[in-house]
Amino acid sequence: MFHRLWTLIRKELQSLLREPQTRAILILPVLIQVILFPFAATLEVTNATIAIYDEDNGEHSVELTQRFARASAFTHVLLLKSPQEIRPTIDTQKALLLVRFPADFSRKLDTFQTAPLQLILDGRNSNSAQIAANYLQQIVKNYQQELLEGKPKPNNSELVVRNWYNPNLDYKWFVVPSLIAMITTIGVMIVTSLSVAREREQGTLDQLLVSPLTTWQIFIGKAVPALIVATFQATIVLAIGIWAYQIPFAGSLALFYFTMVIYGLSLVGFGLLISSLCSTQQQAFIGVFVFMMPAILLSGYVSPVENMPVWLQNLTWINPIRHFTDITKQIYLKDASLDIVWNSLWPLLVITATTGSAAYAMFRRKVM
């Protein structure tokens, strides 16, 4: 029995890796994505342009302008000469945001009065503008604290911020663990969804059906190669993250690969379900992308799940990518134990049992 199963698994791997183009498809996209995504898919604001309209030209407004210019988020500073330039600057997207110093700004600061600043953001790029505004607020806050040194303070408390699990708040530390889930999802879904459709197109499905193999053996034989491919791709991303991006892996490799197998099995159910419903590889390929786009959007990678409407948050519970993304980040960055990741692991087990049973039933009805 196991010899037959191993023969089928080996046959699936050989048919998958026979052509150089197929091997390249399984490796090159992984390398390209893990190199490009940490730099391109980031919410950090860099190389932005800030506009300054200074009606004060006093000591404090000039000092703050210089500090804004030295910030790493802003590489260009536009100094406006009249209020008439404000609207065209924002309308033509010459600047992401604009700071306006009133005429009495420095005088009020020297007399310890409240000195307001006007900050105008480009709402067409609301996310980046809001992040840049937070940078400016931090700069202003730090300058305010410097002015208060040696002066009577309302209290003696001080807020000390420590960033756990990502000390430098490097966005790559968020992207790379999430990429493990994204890339392995694509690998598993493509391998499993195209497997049965490829057999139909090549005319080898009938030969497989008349073989001594049982239904569950064929089912497992189609699933195991996808798990092997997913594990291999995850290992590539993990190695690049550790040695190329210097992101330390804090957790247990055994726990990581255990949850990786559970996650792969949950995706195998989706993939074989798509493969059983499709007659051609083209249909299966389209089915994969119909699944992938909503799954990625609802995974918490693009935007936090907590920011979604409640009904959409409830819908994300059936999305395996959401749970494995949480598991990967907790194991990778936090050295989480099985007790901690269990809250995300048990939904994966439920999804695995549900999709696996549905795919097996559909596989028997449509294929056998």
UniProtKB/Swiss-Prot annotation:
TM annotation in the entry: 25-45, 174-194, 223-243, 254-274, 285-305, 340-360
UniProt GO MF annotations: ABC-type transporter activity; efflux transmembrane transporter activity
Cellular component GO terms held in the UniProt record: ATP-binding cassette (ABC) transporter complex, substrate-binding subunit-containing; plasma membrane
Cytoplasmic side: 1-24, 195-222, 275-284, 361-368
Induction info: Repressed by the transcriptional regulator CecR.
Regions of this protein lying in the Periplasmic compartment: 46-173, 244-253, 306-339
Tagged with keyword Repeat: no
UniProt topology in membrane: Multi-pass membrane protein
Statement: the UniProt record of this protein carries the keyword Cell membrane: yes
UniProt similarity note: Belongs to the ABC-2 integral membrane protein family.
Free-text function comment from the UniProt entry: Part of the ABC transporter complex YbhFSR that could be involved in efflux of cefoperazone. Probably involved in the translocation of the substrate across the membrane.
Protein name stated in the entry: Probable multidrug ABC transporter permease YbhR
Organism of provenance: Escherichia coli (strain K12)
